[in-house]
From Swiss-Prot:
Name of this protein: Temporin-La
Similarity annotation: Belongs to the frog skin active peptide (FSAP) family. Temporin subfamily.
A Pfam family recorded for this sequence: FSAP_sig_propep
Role according to the record: Antimicrobial peptide with amphipathic alpha-helical structure that acts against both Gram-positive and Gram-negative bacteria and the fungus Candida albicans. Is active against S.aureus ATCC 25923 (MIC=2.5 ug/ml), S.suis 2 CVCC 606 (MIC=15.6 ug/ml), Salmonella ATCC 20020 (MIC=15.6 ug/ml), P.aeruginosa ATCC 227853 (MIC=60 ug/ml), and C.albicans ATCC10231 (MIC=31.25 ug/ml). Is not active against B.subtilis ADB403, E.coli ATCC 25922, and K.pneumoniae ATCC 700603. Also shows a strong antitumor activity, but no hemolytic activity.
Propeptide intervals in chain numbering: 23-47
Keyword entries, A-Z: Amidation, Amphibian defense peptide, Antibiotic, Antimicrobial, Cleavage on pair of basic residues, Fungicide, Immunity, Innate immunity, Membrane, Secreted, Signal, Target cell membrane, Target membrane
Organism: Aquarana catesbeiana (American bullfrog)
GO BP terms in the entry: defense response to bacterium; defense response to fungus; innate immune response; killing of cells of another organism
Residue numbers bearing the Leucine amide modification: 60
InterPro entries noted in UniProt: Frog_antimicrobial_propeptide
Length: 62
């Protein structure tokens, strides 16, 4: 019974953290919408480029 409670508590905790990150991301997106649309596109491209570079470094090595 205890391992089951422990697992459920862990899932609840991780779900809460994930929800918190989603809310923060949504708040950031709402702030970006108030800015110039062209500026927002540049910010999104920079974020995307950063993730692509990390993935390429992971597979190709440094």
């Amino acid at each position: 019974m205890f391992p089951l409670k422990k697992s459920l508590l862990l899932l609840f905790f991780l779900g809460t953290i994930n929800l918190s990150f989603c809310e923060e991301e949504r708040d950031v997106d709402q702030d970006e919408r108030r800015d110039d649309p062209g500026e927002r596109n540049v910010q999104v491209e920079k974020r995307l480029l950063r993730h692509v570079v990390k993935i390429l470094e992971k597979y190709l090595g440094k």
